[in-house]
Amino acid sequence: MTNIRKSHPLLKIMNDAFIDLPAPSNISSWWNFGSLLGVCLIMQILTGLFLAMHYTSDTTTAFSSVAHICRDVNYGWIIRYLHANGASMFFICLYIHVGRGLYYGSYTFLETWNVGIILLFTVMATAFMGYVLPWGQMSFWGATVITNLLSAIPYIGTTLVEWIWGGFSVDKATLTRFFAFHFILPFIITALVAVHLLFLHETGSNNPTGISSDMDKIPFHPYYTIKDILGALLLMLILLILVLFSPDLLGDPDNYTPANPLNTPPHIKPEWYFLFAYAILRSIPNKLGGVLALILSILILALIPMLHTSKQRSMMFRPISQCLFWVLVADLLTLTWIGGQPVEPPFIMIGQVASILYFSLILILMPVAGIIENRILKW
């Protein structure tokens, strides 16, 4: 008699995805971040659900409802901080996951990669709208500045911004719709994750060498289930240390001041995980140019499969490309730092140089490095 997990229509799907899935025997810990993102998503949906039970999306009560959650709701403080810092962990895992894909050439799985880019945009939109909900100073001004960028679109810009705001400024209508979208988007993300996995399981996982591992597969369970559980435990440990010892480390003190349209904070900046894109936006003096650079800084990922010139898939045996990859990582860290600094010398120049370097590395230097490496190997 066939095992029920192999015959039952529902269990069969679970079995083929998480138990009997053939996986390469040599995938390293960099492959853990996909499952960690799943853990983050589930945790964010659960903590978010409990927060939504007590939150009110009204400009007069939003700020005090968050304070009420922290003070009066049973374990409300830990739910709130798990949700806020969980977003930071989500983005750390996301960026490492994308970086892993870049380093090991996983972007040659085109469908999986493109769904991943859509996922990245959706998660960024969700996080942005979530940041607006506590209705602190940075929530309000962040929402005003970022939505206002759409006014740079020729002809329809101003109308579009007012349509998104639901009025002539960021107000009650904006907060209510942001809450509605912030609630629904994680479920859309979950559906996209299923599509992402569907495409991945059509081809099977990549591995550090970048060559086919068809002749050397092992079952996902117990080998990678145990490995993923260890990763998840480490993630939860780091998150709990952050939440229990310094929950406000990654936040902005300005967000503990209720939103005031009459008082602009001295430095308007988004959460730390958007600072690299914010730095690219600010490095261009023209509004429309800045907005285009901002969008392209993420959308450029879609061009990477077309810019792959090397005859090897992975960077594992390509030292020049490896050097450029780590320069790119350092450049993104520099941009993150610049995004949090005021717009004054020398930060303006550093931001502009780092922005030019970012696009140059991806569009010119890395493809050229691939060609040079082919020549060195006489391919």
UniProtKB/Swiss-Prot annotation:
Cofactor: heme b
Main subcellular localisation: mitochondrion
Membrane-related topology note: Multi-pass membrane protein
Binding residue positions for heme b b566: H97, H196
Cofactor note: Binds 2 heme b groups non-covalently.
Membrane-spanning intervals of the chain: 33-53, 77-98, 113-133, 178-198, 226-246, 288-308, 320-340, 347-367
Single GO term (MF): metal ion binding
Example GO biological process: mitochondrial electron transport, ubiquinol to cytochrome c
Annotated Gene3D superfamilies: Cytochrome Bc1 Complex, Chain C (1.20.810.10)
One Pfam family from the record: Cytochrom_B_C
Residues reported to bind a ubiquinone: H201
Keyword Oxidoreductase included in the entry's annotation: no
Protein localization: Mitochondrion inner membrane
Binding site for heme b b562: H83, H182
Gene Ontology CC: one annotated term: mitochondrial inner membrane
Signal peptide: none
Keywords, ordered alphabetically: Electron transport, Heme, Iron, Membrane, Metal-binding, Mitochondrion, Mitochondrion inner membrane, Respiratory chain, Transmembrane, Transmembrane helix, Transport, Ubiquinone
Database matches in InterPro entries: Cyt_b/b6_C, Cyt_b/b6_C_sf, Cyt_b/b6_N, Cytb/b6-like_sf, Cytochrome_b, Cytochrome_b_C_euk/bac, Cytochrome_b_N_euk/bac, Di-haem_cyt_TM
CDD domains in alphabetical order: cytochrome_b_C, Cytochrome_b_N
Task of the protein: Component of the ubiquinol-cytochrome c reductase complex (complex III or cytochrome b-c1 complex) that is part of the mitochondrial respiratory chain. The b-c1 complex mediates electron transfer from ubiquinol to cytochrome c. Contributes to the generation of a proton gradient across the mitochondrial membrane that is then used for ATP synthesis.
Extra remark beyond the main annotation: Heme 1 (or BL or b562) is low-potential and absorbs at about 562 nm, and heme 2 (or BH or b566) is high-potential and absorbs at about 566 nm.
Family: Belongs to the cytochrome b family.
Known partners and oligomeric status: The cytochrome bc1 complex contains 11 subunits: 3 respiratory subunits (MT-CYB, CYC1 and UQCRFS1), 2 core proteins (UQCRC1 and UQCRC2) and 6 low-molecular weight proteins (UQCRH/QCR6, UQCRB/QCR7, UQCRQ/QCR8, UQCR10/QCR9, UQCR11/QCR10 and a cleavage product of UQCRFS1). This cytochrome bc1 complex then forms a dimer.
Identification of the protein by name: Cytochrome b
Species, as recorded: Camelus bactrianus (Bactrian camel)
